[in-house]
Amino acid sequence: MIRFFSRRLFLKGTVVTLGTLAVNGFSISGHAAPGNVLTAYFSWSGNTRGIARRLHQKIGGELVEIELVTPYSEDYNTCLEQAKRDQERAARPELKTRITDMARYDVVFLGYPNWWATIPMPIASFLEQYDFSGKTIVPFVSHGGGRLGQSVTDIAKLCPSSRILEALSVRYSGGSSLSGDMDAWLGRIGIRS
């Protein structure tokens, strides 16, 4: 099921831009070419990774996984403790992933799991590490029932000079409806064949 951020969030200052950017036969308003699109994602369980790969097949551009210098534990309960502690301290875990020329990207599709109704701290690290001024950020979120939480609002707070488009909300890995849900979402945000 797809959900998007509220009108209230829009009215609080998040700018939604629908222009025309050519991306692998698609277009989003107001931007340039497929090489100017980055799909960056953080995934612990693999759900967000699968969504990111499917999205990348549809839109092209560059695909980058946001990885940590010290990854979270592979054990679910230990990971929960580590990630919750990071959330409580508003930690900014050090990223192993480096984007050498972020300035070349106009549009950043940003994928992450909803942890405690917001972005995981590695996403906060990523958003603070680069200048997103003037860029269009398009969130996509995997979740176990919490949908977007306040994640889009938190992205807008970290990137006040960016345009944020409607987010895609995907329960777990999206199942058999993912491709159709993704196509409908891409159409709503102005990406079309």
Where would I find each of the regions flagged by the language model?
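Boundary at the C-terminal end of the N-terminal hydrophobic targeting segment
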Residues: 27-32
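FMN-binding flavodoxin-like domain, especially the glycine-rich phosphate-binding loop
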Residues: 2-5, 33-74, 81-82, 87-193
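N-terminal secretory signal peptides and thylakoid transit peptides that target proteins
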Residues: 1-18
